[in-house]
C-alpha cells in the first residue's frame, strides 16, 4: 500500500482531564504501520504514513496564528499571543511570548520534513500534546537484529513547540514516541 492510499485502520477517541500522557481534548495522535499504541489512543493507519499524510489526517486539523497582547484595548509592546484554531471550532491561546519568538506553523514544519527526507520519510507516529503546545513527528530510520532475534529500531524525533519553551529540534532515539512519557525517554 502506498502512502497515498493509507486509510485509518482504527480510531479511538477518548476525552481526558489532565493526565501524565499530556494528550488533551484538542490533541491528535496518528500511528503508522498498523501498530496501535499500548494506551489505545489515536488513529492507526495501515501501511506507510508520509509526513504530508500525517499532517492532513491528524495533526493539521488546526491553524496556528499570532495576535497582539492587549491591555485596556491597546497593544503591549514586546509581546504576542500564540493561539490555535481547531477543526472542531475550538480556539485556544497557547502562550504569551516575546516579539523575538518566531512561530513555525505546523504546515511549514511538515513541509521541512518532506524536503529533508526527499519525500521518502516513513512516519511511525506523530501528534500534539498539551492542547497543541507541543508537536512531534517520529520518522523511522534503521532496523536491525541483535543475536538474531531482538529487533532494534532507530528513529528521528522531530519536535516543535508553540508555547515558547523550546525550539525546533531533532533527536535520535530507539523509543517509539506515542505520548509525553515516551517523549521524555
Spans of features found by a protein language model:
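Feature for intrinsically disordered/low-complexity regulatory segments and propeptides
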Residues: 2-4, 10-112
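Intrinsic disorder/low-complexity polar-acidic segments
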Residues: 105-185
